[in-house]
A protein has these predicted regions:
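Active-site neighborhood of phospho(di)ester-bond hydrolases with catalytic His/Asp-centered motifs
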Residues: 5-8, 31-36, 57-63, 81-83, ...
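N-terminal active-site segment of His-dependent metallophosphoesterases
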Residues: 1-52, 123-125
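Binuclear metal-dependent phosphoesterase catalytic core
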Residues: 86-90, 155-161, 174-215
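Active-site environment of divalent metal-dependent phosphoester hydrolases
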Residues: 10-15, 38-42, 63-70, 102-105, ...
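Short, hinge-like loop/turn segments at secondary-structure boundaries
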Residues: 50, 75-79, 148, 184, ...
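Short amphipathic alpha-helical segments and helix-helix/interface helices
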Residues: 20, 43-51, 69-73, 120-121, ...
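Active-site-proximal beta-strand elements of phosphoester/diester hydrolases
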Residues: 1-10, 91-100, 129-133, 184-189, ...
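Conserved catalytic scaffold of divalent metal-dependent phosphoesterases
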Residues: 58, 65-153
Length: 215
């Protein structure tokens, strides 16, 4: 399975076109959008464009996505909202949590509350590809090169559940890949010049370590 992960499209035509080109160039089996797919208006237009790509698109809501993100996603045959659910593609389990950290950026939705984290732990296992919007605290979360703006709640969740991979965005200027224990964390924001991340899994040997790269 080839996964193409992006975040922070913000409904910008140029970034939608960048994703379209990425799908054409890399021929992924699934597109992951790790939040801020839309902006502060109706996400229908960007979802419509992504739906036309002809591959499954799994998505979570970020801080600039409207509260009706999940409802709008249901209108499109190729779009799946991952919020608080597990979804398998080619046998590989995905799970997601919508929302973002409350500080230092203002946002209309935060998922890092104790009860939500407890519920999320129930859908995350060691093979899970977890899709969230913010990075964990201290990992790929630097703003202006010095301020950590990630989530401490997510960091604790990763330590407790040890998912296989975390795909995130939110911090535009700190894209990359890093390990948190046994978990590979990828900040796949495309808000600057990047195309996101490509991750290749072995269908014949699902337990084999995936090959990931930024593009």
């Amino acid at each position: 399975m080839r996964l193409y992960a992006v975040a922070d499209i913000h409904a910008k035509p140029g970034l939608i076109e960048r994703v379209r080109k990425g799908v054409a160039d890399y021929a992924p089996d699934v597109l992951v959008t790790a939040g801020d797919t839309g902006n502060y208006v109706n996400p229908g237009r960007v979802f419509g464009c992504l739906n036309e790509l002809g591959i499954p698109v799994v998505s979570v809501r970020g801080n600039t996505d409207r509260l009706w993100h999940e409802r709008v996603a249901r209108r499109y045959s190729n779009i799946v909202s991952l919020h608080m659910k597990e979804y398998k593609i080619k046998g590989f389990p995905f799970a997601g949590i919508s929302g973002t950290v409350p500080v230092p950026f203002r946002s209309r939705f935060s998922f890092f509350e104790t009860d939500m984290l407890k519920k999320a732990a129930g859908i995350i296992g060691p093979e899970t590809i977890l899709v969230v919007h913010p990075p964990p605290y201290g990992t790929l979360d630097r703003v202006a090169g010095r301020l950590s703006a990630g989530s401490k709640g997510l960091k604790r969740l990763i330590a407790g559940c040890r998912p296989r991979m975390v795909l995130c965005g939110h911090i535009h200027e700190d894209t990359g890949m890093a390990a948190v224990g046994d978990t590979l964390v990828i900040n796949c924001s495309i808000a600057d010049a990047q195309y996101g991340a490509i991750v290749d899994f072995d269908d014949q040997d699902p337990g084999r370590a995936p090959v990931a790269r930024l593009v």
